[in-house]
Design a protein with these regions (language model features):
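Noncatalytic scaffold domains of N-terminal-nucleophile
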Residues: 30-52, 56, 62-221, 225-227, ...
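Bacterial N-terminal signal peptides that target proteins for export
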Residues: 1-15
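Extended C-terminal subregions enriched in glycine
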Residues: 303, 319, 375, 417, ...
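Internal maturation/activation junctions in enzymes
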Residues: 293-384, 398, 509
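Short, small/polar residue-rich loop motifs at catalytic or cofactor-binding pockets
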Residues: 257, 363-366, 421-423
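Bacterial N-terminal signal peptides
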Residues: 12-26
């Protein structure tokens, strides 16, 4: 293969500054593993404290829904640049009995919003939609959890109230939007230091206002957030600063049941969620790739096929939204027809594909959590605020900052609609049994990362750590393929080979530029889970100590 050998990118042993104030010794600075193997439950998340929150629930006898809810609330505290309780989520659940369901906690456009007359802002209150994270997590816990909500939310409340130490990557992200954060009282109070400027790596970020809000949610199951005094405060703040969300919008919001979409890839069952998520895109890309023989192709040839398959499938996102559209997009016949448009090596210069040009509307600022418990429940959960820090507007006194949904961000989205994106919580099953639990952060690159990890495992026989470390490709336009060259990336010979196929090629050495995945694999022969958190990120994978949920 024309990239660094299968030992791959080394999994980091992070020593981040994770000490939580007020003597929480269990979170003292320590080496952080990005992979784990266990016969018990397991969790992987993009921040060590979120993974610890999830494992804490498993160790207390909770199930995967408890762990995912805890990790999701926790990550909303410790990765505010990526997500928030004022944001959106998509949740895919495989139950212990083998059934699958989905929860749509996507932000929704307010009823009085008119895209023709609304400001085309790229941040601020005018971009704020109706938040869905709290409703999504409340539904996940109420319908599938087993521990008391106060127990499940305790880690997030602790992190907000006592504080956590900023990681190096967070410092860079917060600094990028410092001026925008300083524009509103709430965001300035939450994320700007008293002496000015954003928080640095190692600084203790305390969010006491957010802690109070989380306590209210834990006490009343989110009722105050959508229909009580918290809702009244949020609506007054948003409307008073040029936004559109009203108390009625908040009161009427519901986390909806997602349409589950299915497909197959080389004998494995694929399961995802339809729009607003991009499960059908991920399935179609894999089913296009299934039309080609991996064993007969070089690594550069397979990279070119993979990039095109993802590009073609991604063009489907705008046309999805009905049962018939989902069935067409995930059908083998449609994959066959789309595969005929893929250019194989030696076919001459690249021309336009079915994909068209698309903006990367989610940016790279999203987070993902994967959880499995020993009883067979699996959760794959994506949570986001859209671009970095979302709207960059927060309600003072509540500590809640909001996702960007409206205005210049998603432009022509209509009242009542939910913001569709490339988020793709995903499952791979073999003979009805768990095989992979996967998802990623990274905007339009999310399906690309998921598809390539799955292909590396199934087609190349890699374990998850190898598949995660292997270099990725992405096709941002009809004739351009980007290739990851940060070590251990694609070698120059591979880059030149793809260029020789007739594509323009851009070598991208920046780590983390090809999405950031979280993956679990069940090894049936060993009866154990293998978990890996993205090696280009600062996350963590942890196995539970307790063997079974209550």
């Amino acid at each position: 293969m024309m990239f660094v050998a299968r030992c791959g990118r080394p999994m980091r042993s992070l020593v981040p500054l994770l000490v939580v104030a007020a003597g929480a010794g269990r979170l003292a600075a320590q080496g952080i593993d990005q992979q784990a193997r266990t016969r018990s439950g397991v969790v992987a998340a993009a921040h060590p404290l979120a993974a610890m929150a999830g494992r804490r629930m498993l160790d207390e006898g909770g199930n995967a829904a408890d762990a995912a809810t805890a990790a999701a609330f926790a990550v909303a505290v410790v990765l505010p640049e990526m997500n928030s309780i004022g944001g959106r989520n998509q949740i895919l659940v495989r139950h212990a009995d083998g059934t699958v369901s989905g929860i749509d906690g996507t932000t929704q456009v307010p009823r009085d919003y008119d895209p023709a007359t609304a400001p085309k802002a790229d941040h601020g209150y005018a971009t704020v939609g109706i938040p869905g994270v709290v409703a999504g997590l409340m539904r996940l816990h109420k319908e599938h959890g087993s521990l008391p909500l106060a127990v499940v939310m305790a880690p997030a409340i602790e992190y907000a109230e006592r504080g956590f130490r900023m990681l190096p990557g967070q410092e860079r992200n917060h600094e990028r939007v410092a001026e925008d954060l300083a524009e509103t009282d709430g965001a300035r109070r939450s994320f700007i230091r008293p002496e000015g400027g954003t928080y640095r790596a190692g600084d203790l970020l305390v969010q006491r206002d957010l802690a109070k809000t989380l306590r209210r949610i834990a006490a009343d199951g989110g009722e105050s957030f959508y229909r009580g005094d918290l809702a009244r405060t949020m609506a007054a703040d948003i409307q008073g600063n040029g936004g559109f969300v009203t108390r009625r919008d908040l009161a009427d919001y519901r986390a909806e049941t997602s349409r589950v979409v299915r497909g197959t890839y080389r004998g494995y069952d694929l399961v995802g969620l339809d729009v607003p998520a991009a499960g059908a895109v991920t399935i179609q890309a894999l089913q296009i790739m299934e039309r080609f023989d991996r064993a007969s192709m070089s690594a550069p040839g397979w990279a070119a096929v993979t990039a095109q398959a993802i590009r073609i499938a991604s063009g489907e996102l705008g046309g999805l939204g009905s049962d018939s559209a989902a069935l067409r997009a995930t059908s083998k016949d449609w994959a066959r027809r789309m595969a005929e448009t893929v250019r194989l090596p030696g076919m001459g210069p690249a021309a336009a594909t079915a994909g068209g040009d698309r903006p990367d509307e989610e940016g790279h600022f999203t987070t993902h959590i994967v959880v499995a418990d020993s009883a067979g429940m699996l959760v794959s959960l994506t949570q986001t605020v859209g671009p970095i820090m979302g709207s960059r507007a927060a309600t003072k006194g509540l500590g809640v900052h909001y996702a960007a949904t409206l205005g210049g961000y998603l432009s022509s989205i209509e009242a009542g609609a939910r913001a569709r994106s490339f988020v793709s919580p995903f499952l791979v099953l073999k003979d009805g049994e768990p095989f992979l639990v996967v998802g990623a952060a990274g905007g339009s690159r999310i399906p690309a990362a998921i598809v390539q990890v799955i292909s590396r495992v199934i087609d190349d026989g890699m374990d998850v750590a190898e598949a995660m470390a292997a270099p990725r490709v992405f096709m941002p336009s009809d004739t351009l393929i980007e290739m990851e060259t940060s070590a251990p990336g694609w070698r120059p010979a591979a880059v030149e080979a793809v260029r020789g196929f007739g594509f323009r090629v851009r070598a991208v050495p920046a780590p983390g530029s090809f999405a950031r995945a979280q993956v679990l694999r069940f090894r049936k022969d060993a009866g154990e889970w293998e978990a890996v958190s993205e090696p280009d990120d600062e996350g963590m994978a942890l196995g539970a100590v307790r063997r079974a949920p209550r």
